[in-house]
Amino acid sequence: MSGPIVLGIESTCDETAASVVQGRILISNVVASSMDEHARYGGVIPEIASRAHAEAFVPCVSKALADANMTLSDVDAIAVSAGPGLAGCLAVGVSGAKSLAWAANKPIYGINHVIGHIAVTQLQFGPFPEDTLALIVSGGHTSLLHVEDVARHIDVVGTTLDDAAGECFDKVARLLGFPYPGGPHIDRHAQLGDPHAIKVPQGLTQGKAGQQHPYDFSFSGVKTAVARWIEEQQAQGNEIPVDDVCASLADSVATVLAKKAMRGCEQYDSKTLIVGGGFSANSQLRAKLLEVGAEHGVEVRVPQLKLCTDNGAMVAMLGVNLVEAGVAPSNPDFAIDSAMPLTKISM
């Protein structure tokens, strides 16, 4: 094996994670989730998540190093998610990573969590071809990005104007009575339903709005339309066809994401589309992207499920890219940025 060895630490939301990556090889990957603690509240509670990070930080990092048969002295650098994310959660991971870097006299990189979702695909697919586009879909982000240089230059092609795809799913899931997180439940029911049973709008794909925002995303109207349909059926005393609702919603969202992504690939003459973020685990989206990618001659790189959701490997992999590119480490007293812009790759 060759290449820099980087310890990656993740704590942006409800997963505490640590990983060791050497070059393009994943050596260890440890994730501790506090998801079950948030389920009864129907969403992530920042205070609970922060406390869970504090409890899981040392065990996660220790296990990641032990699984890699390494100590801190063996790593070349430490990378940690500095944003975007929940401020209290970020603070736990960043303060812990800074302490480790100071104690071991190692350089530290405060990285952009979202760009990490792009970088991690290299572990499965290798280097990025020229003019690669990336579709990042998660609970808080839906963005189309042009990857000129993952360590130095990312351009935003399109982004969400209101609800992200994951938010839309979670809100509809609550209406259907699914426990948190709702996305996997919608995915499961959608596989049993008719995707054409209910007419669900496809935001910003037609008319003047579609022309003005060819690469941007809007899912609040989708959520509202589905909610109204459910309310109308309930008012009439009709039983809700849950499988059909889920299938129609999933098909609408997947179609919009695929259309916009392919339009972006045409604009940038890109033959490679990277897909990342927790929502990229959705089976309807994965199938739709692979289908339209084949039709357009675009290679769609969808990572294995364990690399879709938040993890330390994505942080470590971006750290490797930064070290290899000769990017200067972050200042030891860098601050977290809960609203870190997508064009800022590291602090």
Task: Show where each model-derived region lies.
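Short beta-strand scaffold segments in enzyme catalytic cores
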Residues: 15-21, 134-136, 142-146
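Conserved phosphate-binding catalytic cores of ATP/NTP-utilizing and phosphoryl-transfer enzymes
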Residues: 1-4, 111-133, 318
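A contiguous, well-structured pocket-lining segment that forms one wall/lid of small-molecule binding clefts
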Residues: 29, 71, 188-273, 284-296, ...
